[in-house]
Design a protein with these regions (language model features):
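A short, structured active-site edge motif that brings together acidic residues
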Residues: 97-98, 168-184
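Glycine-rich phosphate-binding loop signature in dinucleotide/nucleotide-binding domains
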Residues: 142-145, 198-203, 270
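Acidic, Mg2+-coordinating phosphoryl-transfer loop and its flanking beta/alpha structural elements
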Residues: 151, 207-258
Length: 273
């Protein structure tokens, strides 16, 4: 029996042949960037031209919806969307890449002490790993599965933080993140490459993610999608983030979990054991 919460889609069918497992990073394994919307939304509020009928609540809601709908894609897409909002309101938007760099500068300030604490060994990586992450990674490795990391966060940061959290070794050279030349990377490209290179079908693919993009990409190729509706601010609470849960079920997630406290059991269910 599951000790924690789990939601399994009606009509779920086990996949005994899974060989390749793709993880999103932030919110799925890493909590180093927890709270990033509290950096992005205020920045957008500050830079957005006013329009008639605006209330601070309506603007915030609009921006949050834009941001969360694109969660899982490279950060640049949230900036492109914001630039469109600025233009719609008669403003002259900056280049989205400028917005991205300014956002990353602000976010770096917010997470600076977390990164420094990890670098100096003052903080246990467990504090910034979603509850049960290592149990899950070890359980997958012991089954001989090939693991990949594909993140919408810039690749340099993904590599830095995966290393600091002690999870880089599970993925080896298969750590992929956003590039300034954003057309050269997407989660879908990573998935397509895995299937093509290994000559396998989506039947053999398992994806863990907390953004709608990777769940949708996974279902589009016939993979099994585990949505991680993690409550990032309360790691280990075992509670769902309801917004994520509803959103990810809406794009076809097969299983929804809040964290990995039931890692071994979860994999047995997935494999039909």
């Amino acid at each position: 029996r599951f000790a924690g919460r789990v939601q399994i889609k009606a009509g779920f069918e086990p996949r005994p042949n899974i060989q390749h497992v793709v993880f999103d990073f932030d919110g799925t394994l890493s909590l180093v960037r927890e709270g990033w919307p509290e950096v992005m939304v205020p920045m957008f509020e500050e830079l957005l031209p006013e329009a008639e009928g605006d209330t601070s609540e309506s603007v915030r809601q609009m921006l949050l919806d834009d941001i969360m709908t694109l969660n899982g894609k490279q950060t640049i897409y949230q900036m492109i969307r914001f630039a469109e909002r600025v233009a719609d309101r008669g403003g002259t938007p900056e280049d989205p890449l400028e917005y991205k760099h300014e956002y990353l500068r602000r976010l770096e300030k917010r997470i600076n002490s977390r990164v420094a604490g990890l670098q100096r060994g003052e903080v246990s990586p467990n504090q910034y790993l979603l509850h049960g992450s290592l149990d899950l990674l070890n359980a997958l490795k012991s089954r001989g599965m090939q693991l990949y990391l594909a993140s919408g966060t810039d690749e340099v940061y993904v590599k830095r933080e995966a290393k600091l959290l002690g999870v880089a070794e599970y993925f080896g050279k298969h750590i992929h993140g956003a590039l300034d030349n954003y057309k050269n990377f997407s989660k879908r490209q990573v998935i397509d490459r895995i299937l093509k290179k290994n000559q396998v079908s989506g039947e053999q693919l398992l994806i863990f993610g907390d953004g709608y993009v990777e769940i949708e990409d996974c279902k589009n190729v016939g993979g099994l999608a585990v949505a991680v509706a993690s409550d990032e601010a309360n790691n280990g609470s075992g509670e769902f983030d309801e917004w994520k849960r509803n959103r990810l079920l809406g794009v076809g997630a097969d299983i929804v979990i809040p964290d990995y406290r039931d890692a071994e059991l979860l994999l047995n269910v997935i494999e039909g054991k």
